[in-house]
Amino acid sequence: MIKVAEWGTGMMGQGLLGYILDRPKDIELVGVIVTNPAKEGKTVGELLGRACDVKMTTDFAAVLAKKPDVVCINTQSNLHEITDQVVPAIEAGCNVICIAEKLSYPWASDAAWADRIDGLARQHGVSVLGTGINPGFMLDALIAMWSSICLRVDKIVATRVNDLSPFGPTVMIGQGVGTTVEQFEKGVADGSIVGHIGFPESIHLIAKALGWTIDRIEETREPIVTKVERSTQHVHVAPGDVAGCRHIGRGYVGDELKIELIHPQQIHPEMEGVETGDYIEIHGDPNVNMANKPEIPGGKGTYASTGNYIPFMKDAPAGMLTVVDMPLPRFWTPTA
């Protein structure tokens, strides 16, 4: 039985809680930490609508004092937003799995932070792992696995075509959905429209797996302008305005383009005949062409990935780890 605590109960956190409750003979849920005081004292059962009397609390020290084997953090995207969660968990002697995109390869955005966490984890004999579907699998770990059947790899081109319709207002703002083209371009320039978070991380994960050294990363963000009216629960887009963002990340070895990751995301792509999907091309010997349609749902893929790594953490080496350091990921069948 693995003792697990969860930190964060948003959409991803709730999905992971469901995964945990589906494994009552494998996982003991020892505590759930929330950041919203309104959830204090309520049970997981009340949150999910299923049987579970574990109470949620803002008192993270009390939960960490129960010595969970693994703490699963599902809160923010950026390193400095999760520091006050990752550090206490490490210092309590807990392994950490976290869905923050920047944690999938933290050296890409803050090498000093990554080295600090690596040293702290080694000092306490625990492992820290960043997971998710993207970054964490579809545009990096899966590519690395496909490369294992190649004699030579010259270049990688991968595309993930997404439907943003299920997501909330924070995602819409970050992708520029509902803006005019002029507002979109201004948002890209001032950093308020970011598109996808994780291209540098995915590029470095692929490079690490293949033994390449990336010398330069370039990113471009272009508006996806709709010809038809589109709307979701959170946003309305008129014809001529922006329905999404076409974000591309390119990684160079010297002056040679070695990795190109393409990620067009928009609301209701089907309204203009666009099919969602995941595509991987490896140019080499032999060539690899993988296509999966429709897309793997980002939410389910993220919390499933997190849960399926839980049993690997006990025997993982201490330190700051990445998915390409870990054993081949797989589905964790619940004990009957």
Regions found by a protein language model. Name each.
Residues 7, 147-272, 276-278, 296, ...:
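Active-site-lining helix/loop region of Rossmann-like oxidoreductase modules
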Residues 101-126:
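Rossmann-fold NAD(P)-binding glycine/threonine-rich loop
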Residues 36-66:
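Conserved N-terminal Rossmann-fold NAD(P) cofactor-binding segment
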Residues 62-66, 70, 79-101:
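Rossmann-fold NAD(P) dinucleotide-binding segment
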Residues 35-37, 76, 94, 101-104, ...:
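Short, ordered loop/turn segments at secondary-structure junctions
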Residues 1-48:
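N-terminal Rossmann-like dinucleotide-binding module
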Residues 137-149:
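Alpha-helical support elements that line or immediately flank enzyme active sites
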Residues 267-336:
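C-terminal helical cap and adjacent loop that interface with cofactors, partners, or active-site loops
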